[in-house]
Amino acid sequence: MPETQEPASLNERDPMFEREKEKYERPIVSREYILSYLEGTGRPLTLEDIIAELEVAEDDQEALRRRLRAMERDGQLVRNRRGAYGIVAAMELVRGTVSAHPDGFGFLIPEAGGKDLFLSPREMRKVFHGDTILGRAVGEDRRGRIEGAVVRILERALKHIVGRYYADNGVHYVVPEDRRIPQEFAVVEGEGEGLTPVHGQIVILEITQYPDGRNMPQGHVVEILGEHMAPGMEVEIAVRNYGLPHQWPDEVLAEIKQFSETVPETMKAGRRDLRDLPLVTIDGADAKDFDDAVYAEVIENGFRLTVAIADVATYVCPDSALDREAVTRGNSVYFPRRVIPMLPEILSNGLCSLNPHVDRLCMFCEMEMDAAGRSTGFRFDRGIIGSQRRFTYDEVAAILAGDAELRAQDAAMVPHLEALHSLYESFAKARERRGTIEF
């Protein structure tokens, strides 16, 4: 009579057991196996069901409970009304991001693609624009849109809001400036010690209680921006509403202490010296930083063109605090009368700006072009330059148009500007031959 085969232990059934063993002193059932098991059962299971069916030891049951809660928090599982865990897809739930409309309604944008779910103003009272949630389709509205309901909020998009502070008959509340947030916020008394906003001022509120559809959200004032109509207030509001990083982390401030306002002689070694070349910058009249400089001259059968850009990489090392913050910011943001730079001012307006009559490190390309604007040779290199003039677009246009006073003032530069313009015309004709469309 053949021996009865013992059922495989949980350790043998869980394909990720060895990985869990490396991570934990007492390995527990992996997320992958939990998902696979629930998918196989085809029905939601309570914690007690899972413990019994997977034969989880008593000493491991608390760890399993925490794992299930973590999977629920991460949107891998969802609990129904009786506390049973199920797979999101199997329970016909949709994970996505809330997109709010100023008129009070919104949409759930599915992460996996597909049709958006319409969220009524009633459902939107539970969430904010940008929240990550689980939703469920519950039918169609009168316009034929698939209507959704909020099942669970996985991640809140907002921790602070900017709004106008009101104090009416002892009631203190804030109305958000972002019209996509229709809820008013009750101001919690006793918080934000030392801050006493005045009726009508713009404040920053830290959210302490989120809406649930029944109760008013709450928060306490952490910053007073000023009067509603103060000059520049619209910029301050926009910066906060769109979450633009506008303060430098401490590690960035510590890192830039190594820089001086001038380029050290040691950093100039091994670079090609272009300081005698009449490179110039050409930008708008209100430009604050100058990223590139140009020079052109007429040579036999064409032109020689040199384009130099600031050598930012020399100052911003990979994975440094500066590098990480620059990645977070992505680019500089320009407002009327204000710039939020991608790099601290000592770099953006200083060492990495090709200001006139100061030494700057650069990367440059020296190109030779024929009369038709075709490249006949080029080279890239690291160099050091001293821009010889900061031109504006209007000044260059006037010089090329024949302004006698400006041409006399910059007589040494005029031939190079005319060479640049002639080369531009060659490029423009080549573009036209290729069928390029001007917008």
UniProtKB/Swiss-Prot annotation:
Swiss-Prot/TrEMBL GO biological process terms: mRNA catabolic process
Ranges for domain RNB: 271-439
Annotated GO CC locations: cytosol
GO molecular function: exoribonuclease II activity; RNA binding
Family to which the UniProt record says this protein belongs: Belongs to the RNR ribonuclease family. RNase R subfamily.
Keyword Transferase applies: no
Main location group: cytoplasm
Name the UniProt record assigns to this protein: Ribonuclease R
